[in-house]
UniProtKB/Swiss-Prot annotation:
<comment type="subunit">
    <text>NDH is composed of at least 16 different subunits, 5 of which are encoded in the nucleus.</text>
</comment>
<dbReference type="GO" id="GO:0019684">
    <property type="term" value="P:photosynthesis, light reaction"/>
</dbReference>
<keyword id="KW-0520">NAD</keyword>
<dbReference type="GO" id="GO:0051287">
    <property type="term" value="F:NAD binding"/>
</dbReference>
<dbReference type="InterPro" id="IPR022885">
    <property type="entry name" value="NDH1_su_D/H"/>
</dbReference>
<protein>
    <recommendedName>
        <fullName>NAD(P)H-quinone oxidoreductase subunit H, chloroplastic</fullName>
        <ecNumber>7.1.1.-</ecNumber>
    </recommendedName>
</protein>
<keyword id="KW-0150">Chloroplast</keyword>
<keyword id="KW-0813">Transport</keyword>
<dbReference type="GO" id="GO:0009535">
    <property type="term" value="C:chloroplast thylakoid membrane"/>
</dbReference>
<dbReference type="Pfam" id="PF00346">
    <property type="entry name" value="Complex1_49kDa"/>
</dbReference>
<keyword id="KW-0472">Membrane</keyword>
<keyword id="KW-0521">NADP</keyword>
<keyword id="KW-0618">Plastoquinone</keyword>
<dbReference type="InterPro" id="IPR029014">
    <property type="entry name" value="NiFe-Hase_large"/>
</dbReference>
<dbReference type="GO" id="GO:0048038">
    <property type="term" value="F:quinone binding"/>
</dbReference>
<comment type="function">
    <text>NDH shuttles electrons from NAD(P)H:plastoquinone, via FMN and iron-sulfur (Fe-S) centers, to quinones in the photosynthetic chain and possibly in a chloroplast respiratory chain. The immediate electron acceptor for the enzyme in this species is believed to be plastoquinone. Couples the redox reaction to proton translocation, and thus conserves the redox energy in a proton gradient.</text>
</comment>
<dbReference type="InterPro" id="IPR014029">
    <property type="entry name" value="NADH_UbQ_OxRdtase_49kDa_CS"/>
</dbReference>
């Protein structure tokens, strides 16, 4: 690849591809003028697996295990959007208990995602200690996931019309205990981090995005709300049962890396509030829509039938996707996660277009780092919160 230098004193540095445990396999081609960043070009595609094309050759249920590999730190959200798309297309109603279970799982996943954003973000700046505290709390969330779904990651828990299984006995009490334990820990993080003068020097006023720029670039999630835009799809689209609990949109008006940090810290507090309310008022009833399952039952099996004897697990509903198109979106930890689904009277989608929040949010990175110091690239990149699995797809 030929690259022309505008100034003979400029230097080109290739940052990355980074290790998957940090910001994913992202490569940055940085043009430096001394220690100042003259230009920056993100290079994508190292984790491209053809997720959209795979979806066109699978039924929705067959495709569910794949979607947890998009954003592998917030897999509940990728599962939710995958089942929401055919639910909206076929107008399938969700039982109230299933909707509450989904909200509980989504908010736990949001906290886990923000925690694993905060740890590497602080490590990028040079603070290693918070990383270990954060992993301690995140481990408790994964224990809750394992008890409810059987898996710590890649849960495969959501189903068309509800969820795979009901919450086990005693799980709600354990989750409430976690909320009581975790809520003061957020204040402990703030005391440890926000009052650190070195941290403030590294993030305050760094990576500024104005309100107009955030809207024009199509940013979403904490990137948008940190620039003074009160936009949260949980309030805007009124999906699941978020209207039945009391919570507030977290936003800041400064638009810098510190504001994006404060928004995510505030969102963890609001997620705990949502969890505590949902766990206390969760209704009884079914955890799945039985009508959705009946769509798949072609015949009543007899006791001695071969198929009946060897059916180890109840079948999941697979039905034809009507010849329609629909866009569905949810508020993921990183922003607006959307699916544009086109049906063609087949069990396979004709088109499955993924709208990943990280891909759109990453586009503003060259503008943010231009004119900054080389050392400012990592705090700015960390404040965006990207996962290459959903960016490259």
């Amino acid at each position: 690849m030929a690259m022309l230098l505008k100034n003979k004193d400029q230097m080109i540095v290739s940052m990355g591809p980074h290790h998957p445990s940090m910001h994913g396999v992202l490569r940055l081609i940085v043009t430096l003028d001394g220690e100042n960043v003259a230009d920056c070009e993100p290079v994508l595609g190292y984790l491209h697996r053809g997720m959209e094309k795979i979806a066109e050759n699978r039924t929705i249920i067959q495709y569910l295990p794949y979607v947890t590999r998009w954003d592998y730190l917030a897999t509940m959200f990728t599962e939710a959007i995958t089942v929401n798309a055919p639910e909206k297309l076929a107008n399938i109603r969700i039982p109230k208990r299933a909707s509450y279970i989904r909200v509980i799982m989504l908010e736990l996943s949001r906290i886990a995602s923000h925690l694993l954003w905060l740890g590497p973000f602080m490590a990028d700046i040079g603070a290693q200690t918070p990383f270990f505290y954060i992993l301690r709390e995140r481990e408790m969330i994964y224990d809750l996931f394992e008890a409810a779904t059987g898996m710590r990651m890649m849960h495969n828990y959501f189903r068309i019309g509800g969820v795979a299984v009901d919450l086990p006995y005693g799980w709600i009490d354990k989750c409430l205990d976690f909320c009581d334990y975790f809520s003061p820990k957020i204040s402990e993080y703030e005391k440890l981090i926000v009052h650190n003068p070195i941290f403030l020097e590294r993030v305050k006023g760094v990576g500024f995005i104005s309100r107009e720029e955030a809207i024009n670039w199509g940013l979403s999630g904490p990137m948008l709300r940190a620039s003074g835009v009160q936009w949260d799809l949980r309030k805007v689209d009124h999906y699941e049962c978020y209207d039945e609990v009391d919570w507030q949109i977290q936003w800041q008006k400064e638009g810098d890396s510190l504001a994006r940090y404060l928004v995510r810290i505030g969102e963890m507090r609001e997620s705990v509030k949502i969890l505590q309310q949902a766990l206390r008022i969760i209704p009884g009833g079914p955890y799945e829509n039985l009508e959705a399952r009946r769509l798949h039952q072609s015949q009543n099996l007899e006791w001695n039938d071969f198929d009946y004897q060897f059916m180890g697990k109840k079948s999941s509903p697979t039905f034809k996707l009507l010849k329609q198109e629909h866009y569905v979106r949810i508020e993921a930890p990183k922003g607006e996660l959307g699916i544009f689904l086109i049906g063609n009277d087949s069990v396979f989608p004709w088109r499955w277009k993924i709208r990943p929040p990280g891909f759109i949010n990453l586009q503003i990175l060259p503008q943010l780092v231009r004119g900054m110091k080389l050392a400012d690239i990592m705090p700015i990149l960390g404040s965006i919160d990207i996962i290459m699995g959903e960016i490259d797809r």
